């Protein structure tokens, strides 16, 4: 058998599919990141080793700002190419919805690099609007205001507009339009109004219900006519500058996008026919990320189109509708937060230990005093072959169930139960090996891989770092960041360190379909073994929660230049004291309470003075230490 090669690992984990030229494997068998076009690589294993020397421990989130820059340029260049090809005579605007990742360093990097592309921001709530207005005071780029609005939200936006901000209040419900008109009159400002339209068209994938008739937001055709009538009566026709639609995040099928664009383009045409000279069409989000690298509409974790195709369809549809009706081309706004940010962050954590189902030693021989069920199951194991494996499997299951029942009634002892257990799993493993080589294996054997997988216990919280994996079964690219020049010899599911049975990952990317286990390597003594989770830059940080009081992980910002990479910033993860403070425990008060208890215990002779000091020292240091295992 030939030696395992790097190319085999590339195929096994499909890194060339989802890596989008940013991720690969080097000759050392380590995952590398190439944030820029100039080809400068960052070896993730060497980066983690360097960070360990700096006392920055895993789990850690590694951010690559250069990838953010590259994503902005890529989308902007796609718009430029499509504009030239289709004779587009208006402007396009890239808008970053900060709900995707509100972390200040991420937003600031996007603003900084996006200035030359006039990149704008979107706020979907009052707190987000406060951030958006203050973080980019010098720019005349667009600010889109979505979400539910009250008087203070609207007043803040209108006063910002009065001071020169290009800010658009997008009406989600009719009552908002009345409120905007009222506040605008009080403040003596002509508001820039947008209206979100509820299209009949919907997206595809996990967020399909975000669009169409089931959409939470937007005005129906009847409500739109009511809004237009209201604006006309209030002498505010000129204030309607923008129409907006959104058919859902991570749209998997380009056909759904084309359908929605055709429908939206007719709303734009009809408004112009009615005398409302709308200038902007905000096509919302939906531009998906190919998480599994299959480029398939059949997968909820993939898309069957490129950024260029998405942009081409957006521009060509609106240009065609405008030209046919003799109206100006609209300025096109796209809110593609997921596509901008997903690739720039990598979560890295260490495997702490493993657990494997028991199996019988190969040299085991049944003894005269062993229970008859042990004899029967041993015979099945000893004579197992392909021709009778289905019958053998059924017999093994029956024997196991009978043994468990007898144990529960006190008829067989613990030793017998353990023997049955080891023999049963040995039979199961052999049947799985035989079935995996068959072209058409019986259905009942298809889940044996999942059943037999090892458990790799990892130092991270699924709920804090990968909430979408738990909540909506989102599949992220996951693979070891080292030893990729070695053939994986185990298959495992990943378990986090929360006290929750849901804290596990059991769905992974494979070359053809979703796999229920991940190919990994056996641990080598005390050598650290790291797993990387990729494309986690969208939503995961901000949606994460503190289940079991595990806080934010360490975060590291890494940039590259011609000389290599540099660690620009290290943001310490949350301490135990910080997360306790969130849930209204005062760390200082906790220490004082324990000091009183320890003093009392010393006086009662339960512990010595030295033991009391040691206990308090450990408690204090633990309070101000990392929430994860160190």
UniProtKB/Swiss-Prot annotation:
This is Biosynthetic arginine decarboxylase. The keyword Magnesium applies. Keywords: Decarboxylase, Lyase, Magnesium, Metal-binding, Polyamine biosynthesis, Pyridoxal phosphate, Spermidine biosynthesis. Gene3D superfamilies: 1.10.287.3440, 1.20.58.930, Alanine racemase, Lyase, Ornithine Decarboxylase, Chain A, domain 1. Pathway: Amine and polyamine biosynthesis; agmatine biosynthesis; agmatine from L-arginine: step 1/1. Its EC number is 4.1.1.19. One of its GO terms (biological process) is arginine catabolic process. GO terms for molecular function: arginine decarboxylase activity; metal ion binding. Substrate binds at residues 281-291. The modification N6-(pyridoxal phosphate)lysine is found at residue 99. It comes from Phocaeicola vulgatus (strain ATCC 8482 / DSM 1447 / JCM 5826 / CCUG 4940 / NBRC 14291 / NCTC 11154).
